[in-house]
């Protein structure tokens, strides 16, 4: 977790005055005079620093060593092709895994590299699309959660019998809506935050419900189980944060670089109710460390359940006191 604990926004996207000002000017010009200039901005921010960060952290030899040792059976990342509209799963495995194809979804065996990681994390409008070669042609890709109707599918196709889901949407608790910050007409940042949440979070919840439904059917009717067709019981454990990420982000919005705050302020992105949108840009150590601490607390609170799921039994060293 060390890289995350010490991460700053300028290691993910450009935050200097000249770059951010130019980006804001391009968007303003495009909206006001785009019909005259014919130029359109690529994204709100330039994430060139993220490429440098990933190149420094990505170790192909270490990945191969994990495959060789049997510690990892497969790795997959997903991305949406803006070029064709298809959702693509790029996967790498030392085992024979036949690629799969569904409506608007395909899987491609490839050696996972920095370009795939950038494509999978290119948040729409915020970061630019990434070119990746597919079937001999360059296609432009964005964040893999877009149009991801079945986010558990890659793990299932790659042979998983148990899936640990680490989500970002907090578990709903009593008084949930009493803590919603702000009221009145929604700001653009508030609308954008909800729109991105619908893209990134809703598909996962629906897919988990589908998997649980299939599990119930297989349990009631064991004769329908067929691993070749995917009809098998697959255990799933969902780890969701006990606190709302946007409320944590609201406490740290002012830690964003001044240039970024200046760009977000007219959109309402520096207000508490716009914190969900700001959280996608909030790569600052105070925020990331609080998320790490939250994850550790939540994992420890469920450590017996987690250990039983991962190991089948609870190791003595992990039992709750």
Which residues fall in each region the model found?
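Patatin-like phospholipase
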Residues: 1-321
């Amino acid at each position: 977790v060390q890289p995350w604990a010490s991460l700053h926004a300028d290691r993910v996207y450009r935050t200097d005055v000249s770059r951010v000002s130019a980006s804001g000017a391009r968007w303003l010009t495009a909206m006001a005079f785009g019909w005259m200039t014919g130029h359109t901005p690529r994204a709100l921010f330039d994430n060139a620093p993220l490429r440098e960060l990933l190149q420094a952290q990505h170790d192909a030899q270490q990945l191969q060593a994990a495959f060789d040792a049997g510690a990892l059976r497969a790795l997959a990342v997903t991305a949406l092709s803006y070029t064709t509209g298809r959702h693509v799963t790029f996967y790498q495995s030392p085992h024979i895994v036949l690629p799969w194809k569904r409506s608007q979804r395909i899987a491609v065996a490839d050696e996972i590299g920095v370009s795939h990681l950038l494509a999978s994390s290119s948040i729409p409008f915020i970061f630019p699309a990434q070119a990746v070669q597919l079937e001999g042609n360059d296609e432009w890709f964005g964040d893999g959660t877009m149009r991801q109707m079945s986010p558990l599918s890659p793990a299932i196709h790659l042979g998983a019998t148990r899936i640990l889901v680490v989500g970002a949407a907090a578990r709903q608790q009593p008084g949930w809506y009493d803590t919603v910050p702000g009221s009145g007409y929604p700001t653009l940042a508030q609308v954008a935050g909800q729109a991105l949440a619908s893209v990134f979070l809703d598909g996962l919840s629906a897919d988990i419900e589908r998997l649980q439904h299939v599990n119930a059917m297989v349990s009631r009717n064991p004769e329908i189980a067929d691993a070749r067709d995917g009809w098998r019981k697959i255990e799933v454990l969902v780890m969701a944060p006990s606190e709302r990420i946007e409320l944590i982000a609201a406490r740290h919005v002012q830690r964003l670089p001044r240039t970024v705050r200046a760009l977000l302020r007219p959109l309402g992105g520096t207000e508490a109710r716009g914190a969900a949108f700001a959280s996608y840009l909030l790569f600052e150590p105070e925020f990331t460390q609080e998320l790490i601490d939250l994850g550790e607390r939540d994992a420890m609170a469920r450590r017996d359940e987690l250990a039983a799921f991962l190991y089948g039994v609870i190791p003595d060293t992990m039992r709750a006191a």
